Structures are given as structure tokens and as C-alpha cells.
Amino acid sequence: MVKFDSGSESEMTNGDEVHINTKHEVKSRMANGNGVHNVPDHDQFQDRAEMEVLILPDLFSSLMSVPARENPHYASVKADADEWISSVINADAKWASRNKRVDFTYLASIWAPDCSAFALRTSADWNSWAFLFDDQFDEGHLSNDLDGAINEIARTREIMEGTAPRYTADSEHPIRYVFQTLCDRVKQSPEGFYAGKPSSDRFYRRWMWAHELYWEGLVAQVRTNVEGRSFTRGPEEYLAMRRGSLGAYPALVNNEWAYGIDLPEDVADHPLVFEIMVIMSDQILLVNDILSYEKDLRLGVDHNMVRLLKAKGLSTQQAINEVGVMINNCYRRYYRALSELPCFGEEADRALLGYLEVEKNHALGSLLWSYKTGRYFKSKEDGARVRKTRELLIPKKMAAL
């Protein structure tokens, strides 16, 4: 996911291709991996002589230089969220333990440090859904099945539109069940069921719209896989596809809900407001492509900007440097768009400022989460080392790919 994003934005598998259409198959799939580094032979490359040392750009500059805040409900919500998703997919103890390390609640906690426990739980559960759902298209059975991908999205759309059958925790489609509970919750106030004013029809339409953008990106990704065009695209075409398939758009709007932000239509529909969403999605995916580079090499994931630029003739270090330039350009684009935004009036501008805070927190949370959980590294300690030294160590035999 995102999309969030795994060079694959989904970090819930180790690359084994297993269908996940039924509860039993989800359990089989989930037993194979998780959201953290899980390669038994990784430690054999401790000798730096066997490693290519890559220098990363400063990923904590500009908008990312601010300190992060953690939601005070984090600990209690994490325990409940971890237990619930493990129960729904009927996971074994090994997967449940690994899932705790993935810590989707920490990610949600940085995204929305001031939201209610109900909203934080919903955001954490949305993360679990998004990564499970995305795996099917990323490295799973739908990655090269265009008709199957379109069909699964159609069934999920029916849930969002309220025309699908009611699923249960014992359903043969646990991923759909999770999404249905999310739709139920997002229609309510972020304070809880019947605890406040329900979401407006206007907001729910925006929430559906953001998910449609995500699904369009997934279909484009699968089509690219089927056509074998992963490395023949230019950077702009790649960004256009990945900013959708990353899953950042619906995650961002989900965080708007967590804060009770309901943008007026003239604000939500303004091209510069959408441009800021595009810019931050680009920033998130480009950062992700650097940090996920080794994992993507291991799993054979092609949708990665570093790999794309290497296919164009750049060395690995040159490609990473170029992605760093693209990230810095995101900040320039952001400030340019911000300077050109009109004033909409007191109430609308207050909502807009909340939206801008959500955008910044989303990018910062995604960055911190990657280091803290060992998402792409062999441990939290290794993630801390990479952050401190900005050195990414890649086995030379792998770096040649």
C-alpha cells in the first residue's frame, strides 16, 4: 500500500503466489510472510566487501523535518486491532506475532495523532484491509489476471455502493468482510457509532471517489504487467500509474474523516487542492521506491522507480540520486501550489488547513513507519542504522539485477 507502497506498497507477503479468495486460502497466504523483513539468509551478507553501499538522499528534509506526534490511544487500539484482523483471517500464531511487528496502528497513529480511539481503530483496520487487498494485485494471483482483477474490484465496489450482500466474520471472503465494516464505520461520525453527526453524503462520495482512483491505478498496473511494459515506460507514465495504485488517495481521504474534515465542494474540486494530493502521493511513492529497493529486487517487483531508471542505463547510485531530485522537486511543487491557492472564506479555509495537515502527516507517518517497523530492513535496529548513516547495503549479486 501504501500502497501504501510497497515498491510494492503491500508488505504482507514474501512473494509466494497463492490465491486468496477464501478464508482458508487467506490463512495459507498469510502464513508465508508479513510486513517486516523475513529472509533467513539475509545475515550471510554482513561482510561489507560483499555489499554495494548506496548513499540515500536526506529523506527527512523540508516538510519531513518536523517532529512526529503519536496518538495517545495507540497502545490500546493496537492490541484490539491486531487481535481482530488475526481472528478475521484465521491466522496462525506465527503470522499473528509478525503482524504485531508490522504495526499498522503506529502508522495510523502518526497520520492522525489527535483523532478519537474509534477513528484510529478504523484507520488501522483500513491499513490492514488495504495491504491484504493490494497483495492480490501486487504479487498475488491477480497480478497478471486482468479479468480477475476487474472482477474483484467490481465486487468490492458493490460493497462501497451498498449493493453487495452482507458478509460475516466467517465469510469465505474475509477481505471483503473487512472492507464492508469500514464502509459502515466511515458513514458514521469519527467519534463512534451514533456518537455524533454521521458523515455527509458529500464526504462519502469523496471517499468513494478516492477508492475509485486507487482501483483505476491497480487495473493499470495489472494491464502493464500483462503487456510486459514495466521497464519500457518513461518516469512520467510510471508516476501516473503508481500514484493511483499506491493507495495514498483513499488513505488520505480516510484520514480526513478521522479528523472530521468535510471539504466544501468548491474546495475539494479545486485543481490545486487535488494537485497537492498528487504531489504528496508522488513523494510517498518515491520515498517508498528507494527504501523498498532491496525487497523489490528479492521479490522480482518491477514497479519501482529506481529499477526503472536503471533499465534506462543509470547505475544504482545514479538512479537513487535522481529519485532524490524528484523527491525534492515534490516539495517545490507543493509550495508553488500552496502559494497559488485562493482564499475560500473562514470556514472553508479552516477545513483546508486541516486537509494540508493531514497530507503532511500522511507522508511523515509513512516514512517513519518504514524505519521503525523494519518494514524493508532486517530489524528495527537496521532501520535505525540506515536512517542514521543513510547507507543502504545491498548484496552485490543482487545489486547487479
From Swiss-Prot:
Q: Name one GO biological process term.
A: terpenoid biosynthetic process
List residues binding Mg(2+) 1. Answer: D134, E139
Which cofactor(s) does the record list? Mg(2+)
Residues reported to bind Mg(2+) 2:
E139
Q: Where is this motif: DDXXD motif?
A: 134-138
Its EC number(s):
4.2.3.165
**Which residues are involved in binding Mg(2+) 3?**
N288, S292, D296
- Which Gene3D superfamilies does the protein's record reference? Farnesyl Diphosphate Synthase (1.10.600.10)
| Molecular function terms, GO-annotated | metal ion binding; terpene synthase activity
Specify one Pfam family.
Terpene_syn_C_2
Q: What class of enzyme is it?
A: lyase
Catalytic activity reads: (2E,6E)-farnesyl diphosphate = (1R,4R,5S)-(-)-guaia-6,10(14)-diene + diphosphate
Q: What detail does the entry give on cofactor binding?
A: Binds 3 Mg(2+) ions per subunit.
In which residues is substrate bound? R242, K295, R375, Y376
Q: Which domain of life is it from?
A: Eukaryota
> Which pathway does the UniProt entry assign to this protein?
Secondary metabolite biosynthesis; terpenoid biosynthesis
Which keywords appear in this protein's UniProt record, sorted alphabetically? Lyase, Magnesium, Metal-binding
| Coiled coil regions in record | none
Q: Write out the domain note.
A: The Asp-Asp-Xaa-Xaa-Asp (DDXXD) motif is important for the catalytic activity, presumably through binding to Mg(2+).
Family recorded in the similarity comment: Belongs to the terpene synthase family.
Q: What is this protein called?
A: (1R,4R,5S)-(-)-guaia-6,10(14)-diene synthase
Q: Native species of this protein?
A: Fusarium mangiferae
